[in-house]
Structure formats: structure tokens, C-alpha cells
């Protein structure tokens, strides 16, 4: 059991026997009213999204999900097939099931993912917090007034755009924090 004030992104709740993922949680306390938690939830079985408000002391059922290591095997249209690294079982997910990690998914990636299961059914995939990707396009840095941290847009192999440091060039590998889509530095790859 969790209370409303303990909710944070990544928490999974059982509401009407369905697993709901907390995607965003914002705690608000005003002087007149009691504290509340505004949340954005996603149903892991149907993909339906909703916004809900909970009181700070509301009691909620949390769910423990099963997790297994997996790798991306192949992509076919909007279908992504992952393979369990221990028993080589294949699992398939649609693009809308993995929309949070879709910007980092690309054919031939070597990252070990976590396949997330609810009652034996694959409902989502989570990537490591840091991944390495190759920059395929970026502009040359502007010379001159560059005091502080200067960033510029860069495009990755799968088309995702990210802000990188001005010294990054085309074909370099960079490390990306998947939690907030931020540039961490050059990759040691």
C-alpha cells in the first residue's frame, strides 16, 4: 500500500484490477486546502492515458512487476520484437506500448533492456539510464560569444533530436540519459 504523497514516476498502481503506470506526479499543498498529488497515469494493458488527483493520505494498491533482461531482436513496421536473454523467448510489443523509450530504439542496438511483465504478460520495456548513440547530423558550432555551456541540436541515427555540447561532431558516439533525454558526454565506445 502506498499513500498519495508517496507516488512518483515509475510507480505502478492496481486500479480496477489493471496496472497503471505513474508517468508524472506533482505534489501541491496550498494554505487553505489539504495536500494533493496530481498524476498522469497510463494503463499498461490498454495504453489509455488519464490524469487523476489523489489526496496526500489516500491509500493506493501498488503492484510489483516481474522483470527480465531482454534485447531488441528486430523491428517490423510498428511491431518491436524483444528476446529474453536467458531462455531466448521472443516477445512482441506495438509502438504505442513503448512510446516512452521509442526515441532510443533502433535496429541493431546492443543495449540490454528490462522487459516488464504483469501477470505473465509483457507490458513494457525499460532501457538503461545511460545509453550510447551515434550522431548522424549536427551543425558546426558558432565561434565567438561562447561563455558558459553552449549547446546545439544534433540528430541521431533513428531521427531523434537532442541538444549536445558544441564540440560534438558528426559520427561521434555520445552518452544520453534516458530519464530526461539529456546529453551526458562523449561515449567511450
UniProtKB/Swiss-Prot annotation:
InterPro entries in UniProt: Elong-fact-P_C (IPR015365), NA-bd_OB-fold (IPR012340), Rib_uL2_dom2 (IPR014722), Transl_elong_fac_P/YeiP (IPR020599), Transl_elong_KOW-like (IPR013185), Transl_elong_P/YeiP_cen (IPR001059), Transl_elongation_fac_P (IPR011768), Translation_prot_SH3-like_sf (IPR008991)
Single GO molecular function = translation elongation factor activity
Q: What is an example of a Pfam family matching this protein?
A: Elong-fact-P_C
- What does the UniProt entry say about where the protein is found? Cytoplasm
Biological process GO annotation list? peptide biosynthetic process
Q: Does the keyword Transferase apply?
A: no
Q: In which pathway does it act?
A: Protein biosynthesis; polypeptide chain elongation
What SMART domains does the annotation carry? EFP, Elong-fact-P_C
Of the GO CC terms on this record, one is:
cytoplasm
What keywords appear on the UniProt entry?
Cytoplasm, Elongation factor, Protein biosynthesis
Question: Which CDD domains does the UniProt entry name for this protein?
Answer: S1_EF-P_repeat_1, S1_EF-P_repeat_2
Q: Which HAMAP family match?
A: EF_P
What is stated as this protein's family in its record?
Belongs to the elongation factor P family.
The function of this protein is: Involved in peptide bond synthesis. Stimulates efficient translation and peptide-bond synthesis on native or reconstituted 70S ribosomes in vitro. Probably functions indirectly by altering the affinity of the ribosome for aminoacyl-tRNA, thus increasing their reactivity as acceptors for peptidyl transferase.
Protein name, UniProt field: Elongation factor P
Q: Which organism is it from?
A: Pseudomonas entomophila (strain L48)
